[in-house]
């Protein structure tokens, strides 16, 4: 994946970061989140902080989708395998991408593959990526792909083709047993994501984050609207709760959990549906059942 500095140069990358800083500050203020700490902690220290945070918030387990490379994340997961799982995250178009995915899963114990679509150098439906999809299907792991806008307002996209979830249509149709999970309800591409889900039953929707992108739509859209439409169309079996938690002192974003449970309860769904969305579907994807 091409970094902002590699694509735009250091000066312009700095401008992009400064432009998005206000949006990020507004977002933290709205949710009552502290500013990310700048102190450096070892992986071992961070792992213990996560366990303490999960205990405090009564959370059984978390899945990390990035963590300083596949080997490093696997090391962290092994510190607390009863509390942590993790996904591979590496260049989709690297010469050994398929082999690295196989190693990450079979040797390192990671349980899925994470991609940032709009950060890719090439189109996500490029045929050169097909060996990776074939490997993921063979390994029976989920693939989590972030489409749509990145970060807070002002976050640049590096490949406009890859912003749209519909760019995955041919890939998802070509590998019907491979589970694709699209986070943040499509991040400004909710309509397109529903169209992809209509055509490809192997595509699931992840609810993660603040979903602040709703404020940037040309029509009113609420979290309740998103859940209602997803339940009406794809059904509870294809909806996966997530938080997009990352830094401390925030830790696990329980504010997102509370808000999403509140909105789902307000719809009046049954307890079994709530269980599917907030635990069972993810457990099934990660092979944690039983």
How would you describe each model-predicted region?
Residues 60-61, 65-163:
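Active-site gating/metal-coordination segments in enzymes
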Residues 55-61, 81-85, 173-180:
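Short, surface-exposed connector motifs at secondary-structure boundaries
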Residues 2-57, 61, 103, 229, ...:
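Mid-to-C-terminal alpha-helical segments outside catalytic/metal-binding sites
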Residues 68, 92, 185-188, 278:
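Short beta->alpha linker loops
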Residues 74-78, 197-206, 257-265:
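Short, electropositive alpha-helical surface patch
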Residues 111-112, 125-240:
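Catalytic pocket-lining loop regions of alpha/beta-barrel enzymes
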Residues 54, 73, 104, 113, ...:
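Conserved, mostly hydrophobic/aromatic
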Residues 48-51, 70-77, 101-102, 129, ...:
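Generic structural signal for well-ordered alpha-helices
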């Amino acid at each position: 994946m091409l970094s902002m500095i590699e694509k735009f140069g250091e000066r312009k990358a700095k401008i992009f970061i400064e432009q998005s800083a206000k949006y990020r500050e507004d977002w933290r203020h709205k949710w009552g989140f502290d500013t990310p700490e700048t102190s450096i902690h070892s992986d071992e220290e961070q792992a213990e902080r996560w366990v303490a945070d999960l205990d405090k918030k009564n959370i059984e387990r978390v899945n990390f989708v990035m963590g300083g490379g596949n080997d490093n994340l696997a090391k962290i997961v092994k510190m607390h395998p009863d509390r942590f799982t993790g996904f591979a995250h590496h260049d989709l178009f690297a010469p050994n991408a398929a082999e690295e995915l196989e190693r990450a899963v079979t040797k390192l114990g990671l349980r899925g593959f994470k991609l940032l679509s709009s950060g890719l150098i090439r189109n996500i439906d490029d045929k050169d990526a097909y060996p990776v999809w074939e490997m993921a299907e063979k390994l029976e792991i989920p693939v989590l792909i972030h489409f749509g806008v990145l970060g807070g307002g002002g976050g640049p996209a590096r490949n406009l083709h890859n912003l749209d979830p519909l760019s995955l249509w041919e890939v998802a149709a070509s590998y019907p047993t491979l589970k694709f999970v699209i986070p943040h309800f499509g991040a400004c591409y909710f309509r397109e994501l529903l169209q992809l889900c209509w055509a490809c039953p192997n595509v699931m929707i992840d609810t993660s984050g603040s979903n602040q992108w709703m404020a940037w739509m040309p029509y009113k859209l609420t979290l309740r609207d998103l859940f209602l439409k997803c339940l009406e169309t794809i059904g509870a079996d294809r909806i996966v709760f997530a938080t997009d938690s990352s830094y401390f002192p925030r830790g696990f974003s329980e504010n997102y959990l509370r808000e999403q449970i509140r909105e789902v309860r307000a719809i009046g769904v049954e307890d079994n549906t709530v269980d599917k969305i907030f635990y069972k579907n993810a457990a099934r994807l990660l092979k944690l059942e039983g």
